[in-house]
Regions:
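Glycine-centered structural positions embedded in regular secondary structure
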Residues: 10, 27, 193-195, 468, ...
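Generic alpha-helix initiation/capping and coil-helix boundary signal
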Residues: 7-8, 20, 39, 155, ...
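Serine-hydrolase catalytic core recognition
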Residues: 46, 290, 297, 303, ...
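Sec-dependent N-terminal signal peptides
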Residues: 4-13
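Beta-propeller folds
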Residues: 19-459, 463-464, 669-676, 771, ...
Length: 783
């Protein structure tokens, strides 16, 4: 009898130790949508007034939204207007009531540099306000065409507009009721036209074109893309009314033969003449315009890049006759990176000086070339990464640039601002605080607004001068209502990568009723990059799903992995090349193990992982690669098979192999071949070039599934096609595995109005499989 009683007690204790109640009410309380209602603005968005040292901004706190006017020279800040007075004046004029705490004002524009008058819009009405005498009048009504969308691309002084119609390019005089449209092109057709890609199938109506104006508006240029041979991709909108609708679009994939082809065309506005620039160099090359001359319409600088991304050329084009000459080239292995704000090319003095960003030393830095493509000097140098050029002071020949990892002891992902001489170098730090900074500079380069914060330090918004001196405190957020809820800041941590040397930086989210004597399952929120690491470095009260998810009774961690970001160095950034599926997995597992060794409250026997897009791909790969370690994965919109994701992504980050093959040409074909390939000393053997890419996919690992997997995808996702998830589903079914699959009807890559539903289902999934808290309620919010 005693033995039986002992067994029953042990079994009951074991069941209780495994099954814990998830705190759904706390998760609901701290859901992003609920928290964000309790906090106003975090940053000051400075709107500089023409080329002055004055700006205005709006800022919302618990007492409402106010608008401010700042004179940087005078170090002064005042209300742009009194919101209560403004609401009453608007009511008098149009007889409509508005909430004085949150006026729906938009498009504030000062008339000129010296005036104190500005216009703004509410609904379809434009008002004019005089700050001096507080006089408000109705100026005009915004035309319906302006309100409903802009199909016109205006020339710099708004004299001309360009647009597309019937796949072709048109121009006409702006603001002239008698203006006659002028057709510049006649060769446009479907998927080879002059309209922006989303408008390419439109025919009789005017739509936005891909044409761009030279600064003096004498010419336009177009990079025309030929996608006629690119294969179609399809999604079906099952919710379309009255019947499901097929959506067809062009979509090139890694290694495919038929990819978009690009050409450069220049149009002269006065003569209507067309110049086709001979840009051909490499098969399937990429092309973009990097600069056009400002004072004339004579010159432009373009970039052409090999399909395998290992080489590019910067070229000067004579816009009058189309003559092209190479200024300099760049080679980089495994590939040249120039995405997400890096890859700067800036031009000074009408092409006499060219600033170029390169990772040729293993670290991203700036280089100065002359107008003939000769390297003059390296501008920035050291074991850190230079990022965006924020501003160029042409008269003082100084740059204001972002940089990462230059300051000893400062988080290497924090954006810091520096001033550097074009001719002498010598970087000066002008954002001294140990925090993540964002910037807005005046057109005069005399002042800038600095918003800085950390995940564990709320935002501060200040006005600085060009030396970084702090002149005026502008704003700090009102977090009183947030703190009243019991909200707490997350914690930063550092772990090592699997190599035992590389530092990985992350953030930990705990339940707000945290008990250090308890054991908590751990969930890793992941995004592998390689273009960015989805780890927060600035302050937020919600951090998307992580804050709420932790309240269920989890430790949620979010940290980077080798291969995740270009902000460290080229080796770190390209670590995953040729290994796109697996490169981040070992670091994630090893990082969690280190945290479990460091903190007794982390239960490494109960591990979850989740992510969206690349994170959806990575979370499934982790569960299938380390089935003995990860127990549960929620994977949304994952690009599980990068062979059917977009061409740029797979070929850039995993690689594409260029294959050259000598083929014998039949005599009757020689004339045609000569047009396509250069002659090789009259040899009948010609070179054919093809490309091959093969990325390991998640469905190849389906046999390994041991844990719990929830796959989620929008059924009209035209970024990451739902076929990515369905291929994994197919492989899991064939492997006789039990799993869960959810379709979000009518949703694309983001889940739109179903986002909150998805988040709640994720709560249930982790609560059931990590806490053992199984619920039978049908109503999701019957917690």
């Amino acid at each position: 009898m005693k033995k039986t009683l002992f067994i029953v007690i042990v079994l009951l204790f074991s069941a209780q130790s495994y099954s814990q109640k998830a705190n759904f009410k706390a998760a609901e309380k701290f859901r992003s949508s609920n928290l964000n209602q309790k906090v106003g603005d975090l940053n000051v968005r400075a709107n500089w007034i023409h080329e002055t040292n004055k700006f205005w901004y709006s800022y919302k706190k618990s007492d409402g939204k106010n608008y401010y006017y700042v004179d940087a020279d005078a170090r002064s800040k005042k209300l742009l207007f009194d919101s209560r007075y403004m609401a009453s004046q608007i009511h008098k004029l149009i007889h409509r009531p508005y909430n004085q705490l949150d006026l729906p004002i938009r498009d504030i524009e000062f008339e000129d540099e010296s005036t104190t008058k500005f216009t703004f819009k509410i609904d379809s009405i434009r008002f004019l306000y005089n700050m001096t005498d507080r006089n408000l009048v109705i100026k005009d009504t915004v035309p319906e065409e302006e309100r409903s969308g802009r199909w016109a691309t205006y020339s710099p002084d708004s004299t001309w507009i360009a647009y597309a119609k019937n796949y072709n390019l048109f121009i006409m005089k702006a603001n002239d009721p008698d203006s006659v449209e002028i057709q510049l092109s006649t060769d446009g057709e479907l998927h080879y036209g002059y309209a922006s890609s989303r408008s390419d199938t439109a025919r009789d109506k005017k739509v936005r074109s891909i044409a761009r104006w030279f600064e003096n508006e004498e010419k336009l240029y177009v990079i025309k893309s030929d996608s006629r041979e690119v294969s179609d991709l399809f999604v079906i909108n099952a919710l379309a009314d009255p019947r499901p609708e097929l959506e067809t679009y062009k979509y090139s994939m890694p290694g495919e033969e038929n990819v978009p082809q690009h050409e450069l065309i220049i149009y002269d506005v006065e003569s209507r003449e067309r110049t086709d620039v001979d840009v051909a160099k490499w098969k399937d090359q990429r092309l973009r315009v990097r600069w056009t001359s400002q004072e004339s319409a004579d010159k432009m600088i373009i970039e052409r890049k090999k399909r395998d991304l290992t080489e590019l050329e910067i070229c000067m084009v004579d816009a009058n006759d189309g003559e092209l000459r190479v200024l300099f080239n760049e080679k980089q292995y495994p590939y040249i990176y120039d995405g997400y704000g890096y890859g700067n090319l800036s031009v000074l003095n009408e092409g006499d000086d060219i600033i170029w960003w390169s990772e040729r030393t293993g670290w991203g830095h700036l280089y100065l070339y002359d107008g003939n493509g000769k390297l003059k000097r390296q501008i920035t140098d050291g074991y850190f990464v230079t990022g965006n050029i924020m501003r160029i002071d042409t008269s003082g020949r100084e740059l204001y640039v972002q940089a990462f990892g230059r300051e000893e002891g400062v988080h290497p992902y924090y954006t810091m601002l520096y001033r550097v001489s074009l001719d002498k170098g010598g970087m000066k730090l002008i954002s001294p605080e140990d925090a993540n900074h964002s910037f807005s500079m005046s057109e005069t380069n005399d002042y800038w607004v600095d918003n800085y914060s950390r995940v564990d330090m709320p935002n501060k918004s200040v006005l600085r001068d060009a030396n970084g001196s702090r002149l005026l405190d502008l704003e700090e957020p009102d977090l009183s209502m947030v703190y009243e809820t019991g909200w707490q800041m997350p914690e930063s941590f550092v772990v090592k990568a699997k190599d035992g040397v590389t530092d990985l930086f992350g953030v930990m989210f705990k339940p707000f009723d945290f008990d250090s004597t308890r054991k908590y399952p751990v969930i890793s929120y992941v995004y592998p990059g390689p273009q960015t690491e989805s780890v927060p470095y600035s302050f937020s009260v919600s951090h998307r799903y992580n804050t709420a998810l932790a309240q269920l009774g989890f430790i949620v961690v979010n940290f980077g992995h080798r291969g995740g970001s270009p902000q460290r160095n080229n080796y770190y950034h390209t670590y995953g090349y040729n290994n796109l599926r697996d490169y981040a997995l070992a670091d994630d597992k090893y990082g969690i193990e280190q945290l479990a060794d460091r903190y007794d409250f982390i239960d490494v026997e109960k591990v979850g992982i989740y992510g969206h897009s690349g994170g959806g791909f990575m979370s499934t790969a982790a569960l299938l690669t380390y089935p003995e370690f990860y127990d549960v994965a929620v994977s949304s919109a994952g690009n599980h098979d990068n062979n059917i994701y977009n061409q740029w992504w797979g070929e850039t980050h995993h690689g594409v192999k260029e294959i050259q093959k000598k083929v014998k040409v039949k005599k009757e074909e020689e004339e045609e071949v000569e047009k396509a390939y250069p002659a090789e000393e009259n040899d009948s053997l010609k070179t054919e070039i093809s490309f091959k890419s093969d990325v390991p996919a998640n469905q190849d690992l389906a046999e390994n599934l041991k844990g719990y997997l929830l796959l989620v995808h929008g059924d009209i996702d035209n970024n990451v096609h739902p076929g990515n998830s369905i291929r994994v589903v197919d492989a899991l079914i064939k492997a006789n595995k039990r799993f869960d699959f959810m379709i979000m009807p009518g949703q694309r890559h983001g889940f739109g109005r179903y986002t909150q539903y998805f988040e709640t289902m994720m709560w249930y999934y982790f609560a059931e499989h990590l806490l053992g808290d199984y619920r039978t309620n049908v109503e999701l919010k019957d917690y």
